[in-house]
A protein has these predicted regions:
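Compact, glycine/acidic-enriched structural inserts
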Residues: 79-113
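N-terminal capping/interface segment
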Residues: 102-104, 117, 124
Length: 152
């Protein structure tokens, strides 16, 4: 485990990083980094934005320039590259743990498989409502915080 990560409160992420090969897409908007990629990404992040060192650990990306962060307190956060310079104020706290992030990712992967076979799935109001309910079941208010819209 990288020594910098020891001060972050997320035993499940620390275990996953050291025990598994995390380098894979867990759903369309989340690609987790393995140990080596995480170390490289965080060195770059902290070189460019030293004020984030010790406060945020980059765990993955969207593949489109946005990225997922673990905050020191264990919460998962998100940064939208369209906002420009990275500042703590530009980082959105999802108020979820790594385990909840994995639950969210598993659910979104399932939804994406459904959309692959039925692109009009969300045309049904009941499906939109079930989606919002599922995200809010993972964490209260998560549907409102989630940045990628599957329907509007």
């Amino acid at each position: 485990m990288p020594p910098e990560l020891a001060h972050f409160h997320s035993p499940s992420y620390q275990h996953a990083l050291t025990a598994y090969n995390l380098a894979h897409e867990i759903h369309g908007d989340a690609i987790l980094f393995d140990h080596a990629q995480a170390a490289r990404s965080n060195r770059q992040l902290w070189r460019d934005y030293p004020e984030l060192r010790g406060q945020y650990w980059q765990i993955g990306s969207s593949g489109q320039g946005d990225f997922w962060l673990l905050r020191r307190d264990g919460n998962i956060c998100w940064y939208d590259h369209d906002l420009g310079e990275i500042t703590p104020a530009a980082i959105v706290d999802f108020a979820i743990t790594f385990d909840q992030f994995l639950a969210l990712s598993a659910y979104l992967a399932q939804i994406e498989r459904t959309l692959d076979t039925n692109e009009h799935y969300f045309a049904a109001p009941a499906h939109r409502q079930a989606f919002a309910h599922a995200l809010n079941h993972i964490a209260q208010g998560l549907f409102a915080r989630y940045p990628y819209r599957y329907f509007d």
